[in-house]
Amino acid sequence: MPLMVLLLSQRTGGVAQLLSVHGLDTHRRNNLVLLDEDTAASCIAGQLVLLSLSTGARRYLPGRDGGGVGAVAVHPSRTLLAVGEKARPGPASAGPAVYIYSYPGLEVVKVLRGGTERAYSALAFDGERGDTLASVGHFPDFLLTLWDWRQEAIVLRAKAFSQDVYGVAFSPYFEGQLTTSGQGHIRFWRMASTFTGLKLQGAIGKFGNVELSDVAAFVELPDGKVLSSTETGELLLWDGGLIKVVLTRPGSRPCHDGPIEALLLDRPAGRVLSAGADGRVRMWDFGAVNDAEPREDSHSLELSPLDEVVVAEGAALSALLADSGGRRWVVADKAGNVYTVALPPAGPVGKGAVVTRVASHPAGAVAGLQLSARTHTALVASADGCLRALDYVSGAVLAEAATPQRITAFTPLPAASPACPGGAMTAATGYRDGVVRLHARCAEGLALVGVAKAHKGAVAALAVSADGGRLVSAGEDGSVFFFDLTAQPQPGTGVPGMPACGLLAPRAFIKLPSGSGTVTCGVWEAAEGGGVLLGTNRGTILSVPLPPPDLNTHHSYEWAAGTSAVSSYQLVVPKPKRPKKKKGKNDGEEGDKEGGEQDEGQGGEDKGGEQADGEGGSKEGGEEGRAAEEEEEEEADDEADGGAGGPSSTTGELISLTLAPNEPGALLVTAGGVGHAARKAWRVRMGEPLAAPLLEGFASAPVTCLAHAGPEGRLALLGSGDGLVRLQALEEPFGSAAPGALPLWEAPLHDMQSGRVSGLGLSHDGAYLVTAAADGALHLLALALPPELAPPPTTQPGDEPLPGPAALPLRPPDVLAAAAYTLEEEKQQAERDQQVREAEEKKLSVRQRLGLIRAEFEALLAENEAAPEALRLPRADLEVDPGLRALMEAEALRREEVARLELAWESERQRLGLAKLRRYFLDGLESERVVLHSLRGSSTVTTFRVAKLSDETRAELAAMRQAARAAAAASAAAGGEGGAGGRDTDARGKGSDTGGGPGGDAAARARLAEATAALEEGTASGKLNKADLRRLARKRREAEWAAFNGTRPDDTYDSPADLAAIEEARRTIGDFKLKSDPNYVVPEEERLTPQRKRLAMLELEEALHDIAAAFNAKFFALRDVKRKVLADVRVKLAALAELAAAAGAATGGADPDATAAAYLAPFSGLPSGLLPEEEPAEAREAVTDADLAAFAARKAEDERKAAAAAAGGLGGFAGAAAGPKKPAAGGAAPAGGALAGGAAGSGSVAHGAGGPSAGGQQGLTAAEEALAKMMAAVPQSELEKGLAAYNRRRVEHMRSKLSEEITAMLDAFDDAHSALKAEKLGLEADVKAGQMRLLVGLQELQLLREFDKRESVLLAKRQAKLDDKQEIVDKIAECTDKLETKRLELEGLVARRAAVVAELDAVVPESDPFREALVRVFHRRIKRSKKKAGGGGGEDDYDSEEDEEDEDMGDDEVDDDDDGGEEVCPPGCDQSVYERVCDLREKRLDEEDMIAEFTKTIEVLRKEKEALAKKQRLVEQGLAAVNADMAEFQKEKQGRLNQVEVIVALRMHQIEYLLDGCLPDDLSACLVFSASQLRRLQARVDELEEEKAGLRAAHKELRRQHAALLRDKADKEARVAELEARAHDVQMLKFGQVIDLELLDRVSSSRGTEELREDLKKQELAYARELAEWDAKINARMDELVVLTRENTACLNAVSELTAAQRRLESGLTATRKGLFADPVQQRRAEVEERDALVALVNAQAAELDRLKGQLLALRRKDTSMYA
């Protein structure tokens, strides 16, 4: 077999090569698979071991990710192998991968990445094709991932569980299903198609009343049920996520004595195989397991195994596999043994099976390792309690010693120790139960040479002195026990009865002071007679003195004075100085040089702290950012710890303590934890306050193992807590490494999670390195060390000494019981036993003396009786103690009182217990389960067991109903107000925007009335000319058109009738949308909330309660009827018995009893009353004589059994007389006795009271009997015969009548009983359905509560948007109202201005020669002074600004501009007329000013309305977005609710989903729909057809009307065209052109309007451009001003700084030159000049600032000075 060389380091070359890995990790579940018929595979540490079942040879497949191998799975074709690995933590790690290897070539085919974060724990291929691979991750994510491994793609993933998962398997029978199991759970998965796609849905198995258990193995049965294992040895059969039945062996014994670790289904053979911790493989019948049903009174079923195979007695089996043919099994146990079981071709399997142990390997975590100094042999202590002698080159197990307890401590003994027989390899081991054992390797294996139980708890540490003469053991209970190691067995305690401890001689123990912590390691001091040094989990070193040799341990081993003599030393390490790194491109290299490098085996993590900066990031940038972060962290750490280089104490555990061979009094210490102390190995001198660093440790885990080898200890061997092993060359013996020296060799050999290195060592010849760790693996590596580091040749060549039996001491008795006494307890118990024996001996001597005295007294009594009567003494005189009898009587009375009190106490206790049980089981019930039997037949009906609705439930229901009513009322009120407001708003909006609607119609009608009135007034007065009359007529026509158009609805107008019809159609359309539709949006009124769902659940619970209560009321009424019926039947049966007696008397010789039995025979089975189960509440409190008799019988039986047991087993002969007695004949009849018998008895009694009967002849006298015989001999007459016949017919008639009445009563009751039972069946189905609805509702309520917070946020957002919208709508309505008011007022002002014009026409008629001049004066624009608001008198109260509102004046009202000349009355014109025109002009101008103001106000309101409308659109957009978010949220919520499974009970006739006339296998595509709704939909189809036909007819009629209206419209348009043509012809004939009448009116009334308007527009544009230019200039000047201000400020600051600097310089200069060559006058003058210059500069800048401010003010003013 070629060696598999592991490339461990590229820097050091081939220093170490892996040769083999010993051990099997059989403690890991599902860690053994079959690759072919001869090869099994198992994971251990970082290797996949391939084991040959025929030869036992091993091959290795190394892991690739460096963290170990986690799981393995075999493809169904057995040509592929999947290996899931573990990744080492760190920034450079990409996570673990699953590698697909070809087999047997072992070449990588595929690589699957991204399935988990740290490690894989289980793998499995699916089905027969193996297209899908399932993987389960380890802590912390526990991800279940399904892979399409051929495409290297993830299909699905979900979290498997929150704890360890042991196994995963696909269903071999149902595609898309798989099962996982692990710690405390089993989970059933299926790939389900949801509305969001394919998902993994897992149902956790519910254990219910069964004890929770880890599920190590499971197997799926063909019908989908799953059989799983338990820790207690039972088998669980699962069906649909629930336990169907628990399988046990007969006698309620578990299927295995211990946990079941493996299950296998052998379908061809029809059996299920199970392997457990009892070393047996049991076979179970597949049919019995598959069809198992629980018993009625239990959830379990007892099954007997078909057969069993004993693999190994006492072996804990952990794996069970079968080859492809099923004729051979492969079994592994937790001790590392692998077996093959060959099955016989026929016959019983248990007898014919051949079990062969194929291989034996170390298994379990390694607690310690000892290499031989002579041979390639090692002692390996496994944590599972097995100590093995191993040939680590060949891997053969030479010997082993197993114990049931775990090994917790290990230390080898030096060969010079007296306890090493013949110098053999000897080791001391400590166990979890506190036992310390010594094992020596001998010719027969591993011999036990010493044993002692020193502690109550586990042994935490062991240490042997350098000379091998003393051993110390530290326990977790805080005790430290000292032993002397001897060459011969010692008696030990000297106390009789105590066993010897072999070569362990107990010396003494001490208790550590409280608060010392738990001991983790120890070493003896080098000084002669020195004590022991113990490391603790609190980072302290305890110095424990050696007990004195003359210590008295006769009564106790405890040395009390030693506790106070214990001293403590706290490990304090110096905090490292962290120099700040230079930000350069070689930072990483410098860090590497400072901190040391690690090779590729460590994942590229250098001590310098290099990290990947992410994809696409530059190395320099990442290093710079990291350097800054590290500097901040270092500064914070330095501040917390008192500065860099200061002391830093460790609170982590101390892992190892070793004496420094090159320095007496110094210790080599390694510490745990995550701090700085855990990253190094330290040299500690107990007299110094700080520890000195010795060796660099590991960055990822503390140093857990430290050893030295080579010449003078110049080679250090280090192991870490995560499986790293390092060889480090030392600069000096047992010293530190050279500065900057790299490790000689380093590699991650062991598992990163469980591979804590526990042992390292070089072979005696230096050729091999052996490592051991907690992952159970032992690595053997070949070394090629440099000559200077190679160990010297061995000084003890030869074979290992193996002493024979004669050279070994006697084997001491082993301590195997976990509850055995410790040495101290055994000593104390031995002394107590000795004291008890001495007390018993004293008691025996006293009893013997009493016996002699009693015999002497009896002899005196006999002598007294033999004496003559005269000499005989009375018996009272011979009474030894006269007061003894009185004392005994007083004692009897006292005991009687005590018994009475005890009985009273017991009675009260029973009463309180009964009250507690009644309160717990009955007080919460409104009605318990009561059975009611029918009177005929065996039919029964029961009540509903109804619990009372709690007060909390009722209060919550009432509160929620009240809240629902209040919410409904508030919603109705808000809806009414909102609807009214909405309608008003719409009306206002339409009236204002389109002119339609009531508002616009009213305004148009008002204008029409005004125009009509003006026209009529003008016509009647005759003051208006023809042009004005025509103008008014046209205005009237315009008003008429406006009024007509106002009645026309706009495009947005909706008819109320149409809206009502649409609403009715929406309400009755019958559109049933599936809630499973991805696009389904739940309507507002149907959306579920937690409050609604909780209210529905409470109402359903109340309804179920009311249904059950109503039925129970009917039930109890029927029970009362039964009681009455039985009473009536009892009376009628008594009458029937009397008739039977009369019939017997009538027939003469008939037997009365036979006649009565014949009469009552049809009713013999009737009960005499209600049965106890029909009145449980009444029967519960009643105690009958039969109950007392039965209790007495049981008590007597118990006493008899107790007496029989006390008598020594008299068997059945002693108990025959004490058996239970039968009730007497006159005892109480059973409750279910026949009512007819009682009726017969009562009938006979009644008859006896009324007259003679056949039975009454026994009481006749002799004369009466003679008379009766004589009468009987006389033949009857015809009358008597007739009378007798009449009596017989009468009796038969009454009998038949009574029988019919009784039968009718019974039938009526039975019919009512049957009806009630049928009703109960229906109600029970409804109640169960309601309860299932409650369960579904509970799941929905949980989901709704999860969604409630998000929904509340969305609702709050939507309500805020609605409030904003309502506020804006209200503001728009307010603006609309204001606009309408202003418009009406403006129309009034326009009318007033028209009245002024009309008044002008009246003052200056058309015939006036000065009209044109006066009209020009009237329309002239002049500058007017407007009075300021709130102004008083004076010139300052007037504003001389030009009227800015001229542009708003009509063009027909302006004739000429003010030319600036003086205005005078036209020559020849009347001055009064001229002044009147001027007054009218002032009126016009006043009206125009008011019109301008109103126009400006209307424009402002219009702009405000437009801004509000824009804001309303934005709010509506936001509201639409919130509604969209709400709809998406509701979809998501409905989707989650759709995933809740709802159970619907259907009958077969309700299923109409058939394929080819058959019910399909898969009903997942079915839709459950209400039959009533389906019928309503069908009826709705007919209704819609009828509505469609009606709508077609209406549409046809409307089209006909539309055509008629179009024809009318065409006629009207033709008429209008004809009139327009006539008007055109008339105008052309009369004027030669078409006259614009409106233009003519405007021209006639105001000339030059258009020219003025054009000029005005030009001026406005010019002014606007000029204002824009000035605004730009102002902004530029403002920017310049800001820049200058900043520059000025900077200059001032500079001047201030220069001035201060100058003053400082001058002060210094003055101080230095000390007055030499200094002219104070010149200096003062220079200072004044410089200060003046600065002041001038500041003044100039201030003037510039003032100038700029003036410009700004000038630019901001609106007067005309800026244009000058």
UniProtKB/Swiss-Prot annotation:
Chief location: other
Keywords from the named record: Cell projection, Cilium, Coiled coil, Cytoplasm, Cytoskeleton, Flagellum, Repeat, WD repeat
The organism's place on the tree of life at top rank: Eukaryota
Bias (Acidic residues): 629-641, 1434-1462
GO biological process, one term: cilium-dependent cell motility
SUPFAM superfamilies recorded: WD40 repeat-like (SSF50978)
Location in or out of the cell: Cell projection, Cilium, Flagellum; Cytoplasm, Cytoskeleton, Flagellum axoneme
Basic residues bias spans: 575-584
Annotated spans, Disordered: 570-654, 972-1003, 1426-1468
Biased composition (Basic and acidic residues): 585-596, 604-628
InterPro entries registered for this protein in UniProt: Beta-prop_EML_1st, WD40/YVTN_repeat-like_dom_sf, WD40_repeat_dom_sf, WD40_rpt
WD repeats: 115-157, 160-199, 208-248, 255-294, 361-400, 454-493, 495-534, 649-692, 707-752, 753-791
Listed GO CC annotations: axoneme; motile cilium; nuclear speck
Coiled coil: 821-850, 1479-1517, 1567-1674, 1729-1758
Function: Flagellar protein involved in sperm flagellum axoneme organization and function.
Family: Belongs to the CFAP44 family.
Protein name as annotated: Cilia- and flagella-associated protein 44
Gene source species: Chlamydomonas reinhardtii
